[in-house]
Amino acid sequence: MAGRKLALKTIDWVSFVEIMPQNQKAIGNALKSWNETFHTRLASLSEKPPAIDWAYYRANVDKPGLVDDFKNKYNALKIPVPEDKYTALVDAEEKEDVKNCAQFVTGSQARVREYEKQLEKIKNMIPFDQMTIDDLNEVFPETKLDKRKYPYWPHQPIENL
């Protein structure tokens, strides 16, 4: 049982080392060696505890009924396995993160297309040293001064200066 559960939770040490900062490599190596030691110890354990030879203890224990009492208590002992409350939450968060990533990728691709259009516009415009103020206002409408709304120089709101 321990071996089967461990197979699901392996660490990709190569990619882990690639993202690790240089000053934390020693800590990462210590973690890797501790993890390997832990895995080998856990793999050496059997799924079920070893069987107890109750006849041997009955023959060697002087007090009558003591071994039977221990046997009954041992057989009645049930160690509860904690229920897994967090895997479902983590899976739900993972699905939500996948959706968020897909939305981000879609939005990023839209921004890239918009930026490519702007880049094409900039590549096709007249060079700045040959451009008049009217050409500049035509290419970049946000640079046009609004003399009707702001009749006094600088012909734009103070906040934009």
Curated annotation (Swiss-Prot):
Subcellular location, principal: mitochondrion
Positions of modified residues (N-acetylalanine): 2
GO molecular function: protein-containing complex binding; proton transmembrane transporter activity
UniProt entry tagged with the keyword Mitochondrion: yes
Domain of life: Eukaryota
Keyword Mitochondrion in annotation: yes
Residues annotated with N6-acetyllysine modification: 32, 48, 63, 78, 85, 95, 117, 144, 149
Pfam families membership: Mt_ATP-synt_D (PF05873)
Subcellular location: Mitochondrion; Mitochondrion inner membrane
One Gene Ontology term from the biological process aspect of the record: proton motive force-driven mitochondrial ATP synthesis
GO cellular component, one term: mitochondrial inner membrane
Keywords per UniProt: Acetylation, CF(0), Hydrogen ion transport, Ion transport, Membrane, Mitochondrion, Mitochondrion inner membrane, Transport
Modified residues (N6-succinyllysine): 78, 85, 95, 144, 149
Signal peptide: none
Record family assignment: Belongs to the ATPase d subunit family.
Subunit structure: Component of the ATP synthase complex composed at least of ATP5F1A/subunit alpha, ATP5F1B/subunit beta, ATP5MC1/subunit c (homooctomer), MT-ATP6/subunit a, MT-ATP8/subunit 8, ATP5ME/subunit e, ATP5MF/subunit f, ATP5MG/subunit g, ATP5MK/subunit k, ATP5MJ/subunit j, ATP5F1C/subunit gamma, ATP5F1D/subunit delta, ATP5F1E/subunit epsilon, ATP5PF/subunit F6, ATP5PB/subunit b, ATP5PD/subunit d, ATP5PO/subunit OSCP.
Function noted in UniProt: Subunit d, of the mitochondrial membrane ATP synthase complex (F(1)F(0) ATP synthase or Complex V) that produces ATP from ADP in the presence of a proton gradient across the membrane which is generated by electron transport complexes of the respiratory chain. ATP synthase complex consist of a soluble F(1) head domain - the catalytic core - and a membrane F(1) domain - the membrane proton channel. These two domains are linked by a central stalk rotating inside the F(1) region and a stationary peripheral stalk.
Identification of the protein by name: ATP synthase peripheral stalk subunit d, mitochondrial
Gene source species: Rattus norvegicus (Rat)
